Amino acid sequence: MDINRAIRVAVDTGNVVLGTKQAIKNIKHGEGQLVIVADNCAKDVREDIFYYTQLSETPVYTHQATSIELGAICGKPFPVSALLVLEPGNSAILNVNNEE
């Protein structure tokens, strides 16, 4: 599975929250099925995301792309350090952890 294509399909057809603040906020409320974090996400933010995902038992995938590249994958003209998949739409993005 091409992870970049799966992310783009999820953004286009599903319900995805972009950004670390919104992702953490939704994770705290127990929402979301998968968190994708950019490789260069700030250490303190990454620690917060991992802490809250452990509490909510939400899987996390660390993408090898930078935040600028992840933003481009999502079709956005700005960096995206983290995104939370609420609904995958037509994407197979939720299978990403099974292939690692």
Swiss-Prot record:
BP terms from Gene Ontology: translation
Its recorded name reads Large ribosomal subunit protein eL30
Q: Which PROSITE patterns match?
A: RIBOSOMAL_L30E_1 (PS00709), RIBOSOMAL_L30E_2 (PS00993)
One Gene Ontology MF term: RNA binding
Q: Per its UniProt record, what PANTHER family does this chain match?
A: RIBOSOMAL PROTEIN L30
Lineage top rank: taxon: Archaea
NCBIfam families, per database record:
PRK01018.1 (NF002172)
One Pfam family named in its UniProt record? Ribosomal_L7Ae
Return the similarity comment. Answer: Belongs to the eukaryotic ribosomal protein eL30 family.
Keywords, ordered alphabetically: Ribonucleoprotein, Ribosomal protein
A single Gene Ontology CC term:
cytosolic large ribosomal subunit
Keyword ATP-binding belongs to the record:
no
* Statement: the UniProt record of this protein carries the keyword Ribonucleoprotein: yes
Gene3D superfamilies noted in UniProt: 3.30.1330.30
